[in-house]
Amino acid sequence: MSDKIITPKIQIQISKSLDYTPFDIKWLPYSTKLVIAGQTDSSKGIIQIYHLTKGKLDLESEFVKENPFKCCSFGASSFASRDLALGDFEGNFQIFDLEKGMPNYEIKKAHKSIIYAIDAVGGNMNYGTPEVVTGGKDGIVKVWDLRGDKPAILLEPKGIEKNNPECWSVAYGGCFNREERNLGIGYDNGDIKIYDLRMDKLIYGENFKSGICSIEFDKKNIPLNKMLASTLDSKIYLFDLKNFEKNNNLRYEKLSDEINYTTYWGTKFIPQKRDLFISMGGDGSLNLYKYNHSDVNVTEENNKNKNNGKITLINSNMVCTQPIIGFDWHNIKLGLSCLVAFDRTVKICTMNKLNIV
């Protein structure tokens, strides 16, 4: 008798319609609540908090603000607080207190126009002070120490300002003590860069010929290990960073969808099993992959783009009718996720059998 193939299933547990356009979604850490940030039909900003209870999503609170919101992060929030870092379409950056319903830190015109990407670190780990990084349409990346009102670090592409590539994605990684912090940055012209904040030095840069929609490290508070990037032209790159410092270049595995040819708006490692990750399809698909490590030892001769591991598609499900624009894994419950899409829905999804893949 042949062994039964075990395949995790991607299942929609809850689907709820929204009366506005969502752009980002996050679980409140260590809770069954989630927050959605977006834009109303009257071009206002909206924040909604939902509570997942008894198999349904209940709206708990709602805030409408002057400018529509593009991105958000809880990375600078402590366990005790519920402070959400937000970037909006007018270039404003704020830390919004969800309990009081108002910002407790705000920088007007942090960027000249829309803030496309935001990430934060330090709020819920004992490795340095809370910081927020923002990336904008102006092509500038700014790191904010929340004890001041000026950027602690400003990274601007060289050249004529009007020709600056737009910054579409930012992510913290390698934050494993009070000094070490690294940034992954992706641009609309296909540039991917890794910046060492402690050394104040660019440690990696390469062009991948298509806009970088997302950047993510597999875990923020460990030495650099793996990094994901997704592109407009239906490609996913998984970078092996373990031997990066020793060999001074990067191995990466490329996955290209030449059948569906859909934009991958984002990729997200599963926090409890970091060899597994999902992609958010422009066609509304949610795709689950596994990265299988290579058994070949890394040397300088075989390091770059040779003898890499392999990315395998585990399962896929068309969960939305339009692009999935925001996604978040629950940090405790394996396989539990939330997402928002341009079809104006929020969904709760589960993936089973992940512990035996």
Summary of predicted features, one role per range:
Residues 45-51, 93-97, 141-145, 192-196, ...:
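WD40-repeat beta-propellers
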Residues 2-14, 30-63, 96-99:
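Beta-propeller domains
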Residues 20-27, 67-76, 112-123, 161-175, ...:
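Canonical WD40 repeat/beta-propeller blade segments in eukaryotic WD-repeat proteins
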Residues 121-206, 210:
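Solenoidal tandem-repeat scaffolds enriched in leucines and small polar residues
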Residues 32-36, 79-85, 104-105, 125-133, ...:
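Structural hallmark of WD40 beta-propellers
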Residues 38-41, 87-90, 135-138, 146, ...:
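Conserved strand-to-loop turn within each blade of WD40 beta-propeller repeats
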Residues 11-16, 58-63, 102-108, 150-160, ...:
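A short beta-strand motif characteristic of beta-propeller blades
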Residues 202-357:
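Structured C-terminal portions of repeat-based eukaryotic scaffold domains
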